């Protein structure tokens, strides 16, 4: 069993926000709070500690009361750069990554990923959720690679991968024992993994999960 206090949560807020017009996603308003602060409040009960990966407006993120770390890799290198920063700074055996733009993620995310990691003896546990195919509307369960529980012993592997130019999460995770955890059970929120790439999508999310 993985104890809650053996997991550090990492909020990924280091992106460019290009599809939001270049704004800092994590600081956009969601139900009266900055999006990253809402994410922090949802994540904190699930883990022992939380930190934020951000690359601008660091003082604003620091005001949330948790450590804030920028990417070590240059030029907004993507989520794996955040993974790398988190693994470098993590002081617990496990790191749980959560993006700042998916505010309805499950309240039992950490517990279910941890159970799967232990059950399968995996180094990584990754969430999966139903998604409609844009072409034909068919609903399939797809992995959500930014929602990952990682052993901190994977740091050396990720350093090698990124130094070799690797930037895609799935290309790295497929090198390791990875448990995939589908969040498609009765009672699971079908909107839990909806993310906001635009301000319109963010406003639409505000009305979900309240009914």
UniProtKB/Swiss-Prot annotation:
Q: Which Pfam families match?
A: NTP_transf_3
Identify the EC number(s).
2.7.7.77
Localization of this protein: Cytoplasm
Provide the domain comment: The N-terminal domain determines nucleotide recognition and specific binding, while the C-terminal domain determines the specific binding to the target protein.
Which residues bind GTP per the record? 12-14, 25, 53, 71, 101
HAMAP family linked to this entry: MobA (MF_00316)
- The answer on whether this UniProt entry bears the keyword Metal-binding reads yes
Q: Name one GO biological process term.
A: bis(molybdopterin guanine dinucleotide)molybdenum biosynthetic process
The subunit field of the Swiss-Prot or TrEMBL record says: Monomer.
Query: What cofactor(s) does the depicted protein rely on?
Result: Mg(2+)
* Chain's role: Transfers a GMP moiety from GTP to Mo-molybdopterin (Mo-MPT) cofactor (Moco or molybdenum cofactor) to form Mo-molybdopterin guanine dinucleotide (Mo-MGD) cofactor.
User: What protein family is recorded?
Assistant: Belongs to the MobA family.
Any one cellular-component term (Gene Ontology): cytoplasm
Q: Which NCBIfam families match?
A: molyb_mobA
Q: What is its main location?
A: cytoplasm
What's the name of its gene? mobA
- Superkingdom of origin: Bacteria
Which keywords belong to this entry?
Cytoplasm, GTP-binding, Magnesium, Metal-binding, Molybdenum cofactor biosynthesis, Nucleotide-binding, Transferase
| Enzyme class (EC, first level) | transferase
Q: What is this protein called?
A: Molybdenum cofactor guanylyltransferase
Query: In which residues is Mg(2+) bound?
Result: 101
A GO term for molecular function: molybdenum cofactor guanylyltransferase activity
Entry's transmembrane regions: none
Catalyses which reaction?
A: Mo-molybdopterin + GTP + H(+) = Mo-molybdopterin guanine dinucleotide + diphosphate
């Amino acid at each position: 069993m993985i104890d809650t206090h053996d997991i550090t949560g990492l909020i990924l807020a280091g992106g460019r926000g290009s599809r939001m017009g270049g704004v800092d996603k994590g600081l956009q308003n969601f139900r009266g709070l900055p999006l990253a602060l809402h994410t922090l409040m949802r994540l904190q009960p699930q883990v022992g500690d939380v930190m934020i990966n951000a690359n601008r407006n660091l003082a604003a993120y620091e005001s949330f009361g948790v450590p804030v770390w920028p990417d070590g890799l240059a030029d907004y290198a993507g989520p794996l750069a955040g993974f790398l920063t988190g693994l470098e700074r993590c002081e617990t055996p496990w790191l749980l990554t959560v993006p700042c733009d998916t505010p309805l993620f499950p309240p039992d995310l950490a517990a279910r990923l941890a159970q799967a990691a232990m059950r399968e003896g995996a180094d990584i546990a990754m969430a999966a959720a139903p998604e409609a195919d844009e072409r034909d509307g068919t609903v399939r369960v797809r992995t959500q690679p930014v929602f990952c529980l990682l052993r901190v012993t994977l740091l050396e592997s990720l350093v090698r991968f990124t130094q070799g130019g690797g930037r895609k999460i799935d290309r790295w995770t497929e090198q390791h024992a990875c448990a995939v955890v589908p969040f498609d059970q009765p009672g699971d929120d079908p909107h839990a993994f909806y993310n906001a790439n635009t301000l319109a999508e963010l406003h639409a999310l505000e009305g979900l999960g309240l009914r």
